[in-house]
Amino acid sequence: MNKKMLAAGSRDEYGETLKEKQEIEQTIINVLNDQGYIPVSTPLIEQENVFDQYQEKKVFHLLDHMGEKLVLRPDLTLPIARFLAANQTTLTVTRLYYLGDVFHQIVNLSGDYNQETQAGIEIIGEQSFEAEIEALETMLAFAQRFGIVDVQVVLSDARLIDLILEQFDLDDQIRNEMKQAIEEKNISRFEQLKAQIPDFPAELADWPLAFGENGESAMEKLQRIQAVKAIMDDWIRLAEYTHRHYPDVAVTVDLAAVLPQPYYTGTIIRGFVPSLGDYLFSGGRYDRLLSKADQETVPAMGMALKVETVLADRQRDLSSLSAQDPIVVVLAKGRVEQDVRPLLKKAGVDTSQLDNPARKLVFDTADNRYRFILVKANDVVKYLDQGIGDVGIVGSDTIAEQEQNHYDVLDLQTGKAEFVLAACKDFEPEKISRLRIATKYPKLASQYFHDQGEDVELIKLEGSVELGPITGLADAIIDITQTGRTLVENHLQIFDRVGLVATHFLVRKGALLQYPDELTTVIKRLVNLVAPKEEVKE
């Protein structure tokens, strides 16, 4: 029997679960209809150029019978912008709402789903800050209506990082690299760049970690910058509104936030549910996406609610939630775990359960603050990105070959090695029209040769890569070495040094909002421990 199977990343919806989802959707429709929002529906399939701002790897691409390039929509705001541009008469103050599915490419064999349902509002033509307040009120009212008890509001702004960096005399490359390091919470790179900036302000010394209480503390000191003060005044208005109308909802700020969507231009508002480790809603101001016939831009504010998050909250047993859920640390078994254990202990993490692991793979600390899971190196990122783990510790060689849906926070300076290009001593690449390169790391090798401007044939090996040149399978290899001894024993020599390898400290994106105090404390301690001695902070 030729059984028909689901495509990877997809799922069927059925029975009681689907009925619950339909009830949620109908409630949203009824509420927004009653509030006077106008429904709008756009096609699942759009012209490719509607999503020019999206990264290629995130979008499903299609071709029609004429060869026209199409995509499955990964977003619902951009199709609405396309609709409004085609119907110029609607570009007055207009309140629209939508309910539909969006599609995203996922990492192969990751276990993720590529389709989710969103309900959202778009407030078009409203320049005043009342649009932000209305959008926040709409989302918080839904959270209250659906009984989501632990939502917290996280405020950020698309302009903030650029406005602060403008205060320094930086060339474009340093400015762009600094912004990227801040948004990606890459503290190792941030520290390197910060050292190049004289008189860097103390209140931003830990800028990638400037969220939650750390962000609020830095926020107070940054109000001396007039443009920043205006942003923070708006945040205060939103916080005061929330506290007045929803006193049980916490409000915090993120001074290091990456843009949820590339078209945002101002205030960004997100609703995070710590116990689920996921966002309930997200949105912001986008004042340059729409324009009238005379090219005058049209202000707009939009917010999207994740229907699956509402459903997940409804289906769980709230009485089983524990305020003491441990932080889950996923460790690569073997040398990585052994080398990093003393460092974690010095940072205040109880690692005693790892001292005599026997055959166990899961360990809880006595105080229930941490849970350790030991896995193979290649599986660390999967556990992290699927929400099983909060922290991942693994070598950068493994990270380099996998998709990144987490923060690569810190180089722990353990497990040091390097990637090298090696071959037999008579290797003469200039005499070979197209090199054959054997490696366990095709992604890294491909990038290396791309940067060199060379076209090569890569051969993926799982075992002893050194055999490639010896047997004639390959002309050279890209592999890891610590001492170079294995290369020498196999009569190979190093022709180029490709990059460094070390153990890295990764954090799941939602974990920093779930456990802000504990994780930022540990991260800061680790920063001090791995810093050169003369740079160690008091």
Where are these regions (language model features)?
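Domain-level signature for soluble enzymes in the chorismate/prephenate branch of the shikimate pathway
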Residues: 321-538
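Beta-rich nucleic-acid/ligand-interaction surfaces
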Residues: 42-59, 156-166, 257-266, 466-471
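Positively charged, Gly/Ser-enriched RNA/tRNA-binding surfaces
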Residues: 17-31, 46-47, 79-89, 98-146, ...
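Flexible, glycine/proline-enriched loop segments at strand-loop-helix junctions
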Residues: 122-130, 148-152, 177-178, 223-229, ...
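Short, surface-exposed recognition loops or helix-turn segments adjacent to catalytic cores
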Residues: 150-160, 178, 252-258, 459-465
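Acidic, His- and aromatic-enriched active-site or binding-groove loops in soluble protein domains
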Residues: 60-66, 170-189
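TRNA-binding/sensing appendages of the translation machinery
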Residues: 1-77
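Glycine-rich, N-terminal phosphate-binding loop and its surrounding beta-alpha-beta segment
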Residues: 50, 56-102, 106, 380, ...
